[in-house]
């Protein structure tokens, strides 16, 4: 009969509550000025190399994963430069027809140029006439709390993990409400103590007043 060996692993963690930030998203979505989604990129546009001639950002397919969305092929344009003729195969927005990208080759090209100022991220006020005058809204920080509970069952142990997503404003509001409730309780107790002390001082005075009224003779009471 084969020998059976059982092993038990003890899991212990001094910190059962840990906080995790959502961090930077791996993919970035960019939109046309009209609000149409046109590009999904694995990094920010600002991190891409810039072409000095027209300040266009360069996407190298060998280095960055990307995908074009809702984009149509536009006509080829020939531009006269000092060193020769530059040929551009342009791509426009499928909704409004705005020039967004261009390439130097029609097919099987690794390089795509993003036209300067043609794309915006979500929340930068796309769809308005003045995009760069709009104030960018800062995303709300979400606090993620993870609670780990370990249950010992002899040879085996089970770990239960639960997460709670809370917005920072909700957490601050709850903390303020708790502090107000605690202050109200303290004030209520102080008022109760003051009321009891006043009663204790008033009771002897009332007794003395009653005793003073009871003093006197029967003749005085008859002529009252």
From Swiss-Prot:
InterPro entries: STEEP-like
Organism superkingdom: Eukaryota
Protein known as: STING ER exit protein
Region of interest called Disordered, as start-end residue ranges on this chain: 191-224
Similarity-based family: Belongs to the STEEP1 family.
GO biological process, one term: endoplasmic reticulum to Golgi vesicle-mediated transport
Keyword Cell division: no
Coiled-coil boundaries: 172-194
Protein's cellular compartments: Cytoplasm; Nucleus
Keyword hit for Repeat: no
Keyword annotations of the record: Coiled coil, Cytoplasm, Nucleus
Cellular component, GO annotation: cell body; cytoplasm; nucleus
PANTHER family according to UniProt: STING ER EXIT PROTEIN (PTHR46355:SF1), UPF0428 PROTEIN CXORF56 (PTHR46355)
Biased composition (Basic and acidic residues): 191-211
Species of origin: Danio rerio
Functional note: Molecular adapter that stimulates membrane curvature formation and subsequent endoplasmic reticulum exit site (ERES) establishment by recruiting PI3K complex I, leading to COPII vesicle-mediated transport. Promotes endoplasmic reticulum (ER) exit of cGAMP-activated STING1 oligomers.
């Amino acid at each position: 009969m084969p020998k059976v060996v059982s092993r038990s692993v003890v899991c212990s963690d001094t910190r059962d509550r840990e906080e995790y930030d959502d961090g930077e998203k791996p993919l970035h979505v960019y939109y046309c000025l009209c609000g149409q989604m046109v590009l999904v990129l694995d990094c920010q546009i600002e991190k891409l190399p810039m072409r000095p001639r027209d300040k266009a950002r360069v996407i190298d397919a060998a280095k960055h994963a990307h995908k074009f969305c809702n984009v149509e092929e536009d006509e080829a344009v020939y531009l006269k430069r000092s060193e020769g003729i530059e040929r551009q195969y342009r791509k426009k927005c499928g909704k409004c027809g705005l020039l967004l990208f261009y390439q130097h080759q029609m097919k099987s090209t690794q390089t795509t140029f993003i036209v300067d100022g043609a794309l915006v991220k979500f929340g930068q006020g796309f769809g308005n006439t003045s995009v760069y005058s709009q104030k960018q809204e800062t995303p709300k920080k979400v606090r993620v709390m993870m609670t780990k509970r370990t249950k010992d069952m002899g040879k085996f142990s089970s770990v239960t993990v639960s997460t709670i997503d809370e917005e920072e404003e909700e957490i601050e509001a709850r903390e303020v409400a708790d502090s107000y409730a605690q202050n109200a309780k303290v004030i209520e107790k102080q008022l109760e103590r003051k009321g009891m002390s006043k009663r204790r001082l008033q009771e002897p005075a009332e007794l003395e007043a009653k005793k003073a009224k009871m003093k006197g003779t029967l003749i005085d009471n008859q002529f009252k």
